């Protein structure tokens, strides 16, 4: 029989949200268990293949104001938190460069009009800078003479996704987080089989928690679905970009994020598909051809990885935190394509809810974060408390 250990919080899922939450909660003094169905490298998570761009203004062209605001708050948190980690993580705030070929000039007008419609006016005025061809070359010498115009979105940034995942886990473990790897499919009520009894369960499983996010009554859209994202990693020592670059195109808009050691992450927008099979030849050609059109030296790059991952997405494309006060379960989901951009602010709010539950607050869903992010935190009732507590061993 498995010996049972008691914890304040059991976190299901060790992707980006789970690791951020574990690190925050253990530093607050909580006893934390982190349970993951796979291994510690995080290779099965959407965060593992992400470009990890921190670009709230650029994303405002395709996202809602809530994402922009969460992103602004999260970049501040990343700056502070990464400085506190004992392991260095690549992080920069040198801006985003947006370019387009002459025949696609109309895409620039659409891009800027969407930004101005969604982003805070002060953010646009502070960060948006129009460039002529000379200015593009001054910002990115590797692109000198290649584009007659561009936009610099100052202050935007990026980080090393895999370095962040490693550092967060290492720090959390050193602070005392108890980890269970290769746990398979685990629910809140099966934790005792792993030797875990927890006062509060924080569910950060992404698509692994699909059953807990059903469709709305009478609705046909799934409460949580996966949207396919495709990313190529290449080694391109002859390119020499210094910041993320977005290439506007009516059919194949791409982003290219330079990482340390001449690595580049090349990706595009998501596909409306639950398919997680390997990348198609067509997709690979589109991404790599677009990169080659940005800089011909990508033609000599070495392809290291062709990655596919599904991003957990709610019908409104916004993140949500659901709080079952009776069952003492908090669920975080729906970070969609904005994981690294918004995860710090979202998990900070979720950890505030968990902290309120641990303190016995009868209205844990109404923490100050609920006022800051209206509608993101929702009180729900999933199951009778006594039944769930009996299953998890909380009543003894």
What are the functions of these language-model segments?
Residues 51-139:
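Dinucleotide-binding Rossmann-like beta1-alpha1 core, especially the glycine-rich loop
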Residues 17, 40, 208:
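Conserved Rossmann-like nucleotide-cofactor binding loop
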Residues 87-101, 124-174, 269-273, 330-333:
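Helix-loop-beta segment of a Rossmann-like dinucleotide-binding subdomain
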Residues 7-33:
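N-terminal Rossmann-like FAD-binding beta1-loop-alpha1 element of flavoenzymes
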Residues 147-198, 204, 208-211:
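Helical element adjacent to the flavin cofactor pocket in flavoenzyme catalytic cores
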Residues 301-396:
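C-terminal catalytic lobe of FAD-dependent flavoproteins
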Residues 62, 66-72, 103-107, 151-167, ...:
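Short beta-strand to alpha-helix junction loop
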Residues 23-27, 37, 48, 53-54, ...:
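Active-site substrate-recognition segment that forms the wall
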